[in-house]
Amino acid sequence: MADEPHDQRPTDVIKSYLPEKGPSTSQVLAVVTLFPLGAVLLCLAGLILTGTIIGLAVATPLFVIFSPILVPAALTIALAVTGFLTSGAFGITALSSISWLLNYVRRMRGSLPEQLDHARRRVQETVGQKTREAGQRSQDVIRP
């Protein structure tokens, strides 16, 4: 009857969820090392956020005052960068197309004589076949 769940004490139930052995030395060392490091990095992140907000609060009036100059300048720079990138992309596309075309022509030049010989043989065979057929028909007409 002691095995039934309602007969167990609450401390026994809690102990059943806990691991039987404690953390290893390397795990404890990792926590001891990384916890302060994480805290320091979190503090630095907070300081940087605070500095950014203060800097933005100070610089916002300057951005508002100089916005008639800054906005067109930013747009001009953005368009110039876009133009350079587009030009480069088109240049690379053109070079790769020319390279492909040259390789294609080189491959075709090597196989062109073979293709011409094959076409010549087919024409000769076709002409020879037609000549034989015409000769056969003429002999059939002559022999009644």
Curated annotation (Swiss-Prot):
Classification via InterPro entries: Oleosin
GO terms, biological process: lipid droplet organization; lipid storage; response to freezing; seed maturation; seed oilbody biogenesis
Positions of region (Disordered): 124-144
Keyword rRNA-binding: no
Membrane topology: Multi-pass membrane protein
Domain notes: The proline-knot motif may be involved in the targeting to oil bodies.
Record protein name field: Oleosin H2
Organism: Sesamum indicum (Oriental sesame)
Lineage: Eukaryota, Viridiplantae, Streptophyta, Embryophyta, Tracheophyta
